[in-house]
């Protein structure tokens, strides 16, 4: 019998058999454990009692995994809020760098190496072209975010880049080209293709690449060269989405991409003893949503393809927005443009305070009578109780 479900439900039902059949790596097992036990009490609980009516509130802690659908809201809100101090009232563009599907098997076999290479190639492309006086002639700033999935949770590594539509020239003066994106898409595509394939060849020459599964055939130097030749001949898809202007619209837009995972709970429609049904975008039919049914273990396999390598940094800042530059140079840009500084509202707030600011809910007040919620234990160093609620 079918029932509506969450990602956690799917993992509880199908992950044990998936693990027995596939022997996943340690960081995959850890991710699965986090998802299955998030907000179940396995990561601790926080208990508070109303001083007036005695009502008891029990809050199960989250796992805080970046792959858990229940743990993304707070990190996303805090990250976006922190960016307010670095966003200018200036044009911004959303550029997406993709690679041919022929490279997927090699990239998946060498995730850390070739994901890093994606960032380097995208960054080098934007820096080189933006500094060229033919296009802009300035140092720009941008944020790169790696996504590895398509709508059906298929493997589709690509880089989303939020690009500031102007920069500082050699005389430290602000320079922009107006409403139109300053780099031709065809030029971006060709330069990015050359730089990424150069990265790939360099890693091959240094014998740093590994070849697993369908990538094993590329251990042969002739097959590897054939692959590179084929990729050189293809037109790589690099495109720029609709531009947006103004700091607040940029901040809101960023939230769509920064803390996404491969699939969210609301896209899962049903689960049986053997299958999972979820909705995907049908790009052959103008992006309409349609239902797709796959086996439960296949769902787990697809989800696990998008667990990032251990300690991998998905959100990276470059140019004017890099940690080294943004304090002085963004302040200088703001002064040149005459725009105000946006002040962070969530900085240094704890979970209780964030809930109060974001959702206008005071978890330190009893939901039954409005009394104060306190810890059931009295602090021996204090004459008062302290509410202890942690998300």
Specify the residue positions occupied by each region the protein language model found.
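Beta->alpha loop/short-helix hinge microenvironment recognizer with preference
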Residues: 1-391
């Amino acid at each position: 019998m079918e029932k509506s479900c969450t990602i956690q439900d799917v993992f509880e039902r199908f992950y044990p058999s998936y693990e027995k059949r596939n022997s996943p790596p340690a960081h995959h097992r850890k991710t699965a454990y986090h998802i299955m036990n998030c907000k179940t009490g396995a990561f601790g609980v926080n208990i508070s009692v109303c001083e007036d009516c005695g009502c008891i509130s029990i809050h199960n802690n989250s796992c805080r995994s970046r792959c858990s659908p229940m743990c993304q809201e707070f990190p996303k809100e805090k990250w976006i809020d922190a960016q307010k101090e670095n966003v200018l009232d200036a044009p911004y563009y959303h550029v997406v760098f993709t690679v041919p599907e022929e490279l997927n098997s090699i990239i998946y076999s060498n995730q850390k190496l070739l994901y890093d290479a994606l960032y380097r190639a995208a960054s080098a492309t934007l820096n080189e072209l933006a500094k060229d006086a033919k296009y802009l002639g300035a140092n720009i700033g941008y944020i790169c975010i790696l996504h590895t999935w398509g709508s059906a949770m298929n493997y589709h590594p690509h880089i989303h880049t939020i690009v500031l539509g102007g920069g500082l020239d050699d005389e430290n003066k602000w320079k922009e080209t107006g409403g139109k994106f300053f780099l031709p898409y065809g030029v971006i595509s060709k330069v990015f293709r050359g730089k990424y394939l150069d990265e790939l060849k360099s890693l091959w020459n240094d014998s740093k690449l590994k070849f697993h599964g369908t990538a094993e055939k590329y251990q042969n130097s002739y097959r590897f060269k054939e692959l590179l030749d084929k990729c050189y001949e293809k037109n790589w898809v690099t495109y720029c989405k609709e531009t947006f202007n103004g700091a607040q619209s940029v901040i809101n837009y960023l939230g769509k991409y920064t803390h996404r995972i491969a699939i969210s709970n609301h896209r899962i429609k049903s689960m049986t003893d053997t299958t999972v049904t979820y909705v995907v975008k049908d790009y052959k039919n103008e992006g309409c949503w349609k239902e797709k049914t796959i086996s439960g273990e296949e769902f787990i396999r697809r989800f696990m393809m998008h667990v990032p390598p251990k300690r991998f940094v998905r959100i990276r800042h470059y140019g004017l927005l890099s940690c080294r530059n943004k304090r002085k140079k963004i302040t200088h840009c703001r002064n040149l443009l005459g725009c105000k500084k946006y002040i962070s509202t969530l900085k240094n707030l704890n979970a209780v305070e964030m809930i109060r600011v974001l959702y206008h809910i005071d978890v330190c007040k009893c939901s039954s009578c409005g009394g104060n919620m306190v810890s059931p234990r009295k602090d021996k160093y204090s004459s008062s109780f302290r509410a202890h609620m942690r998300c």
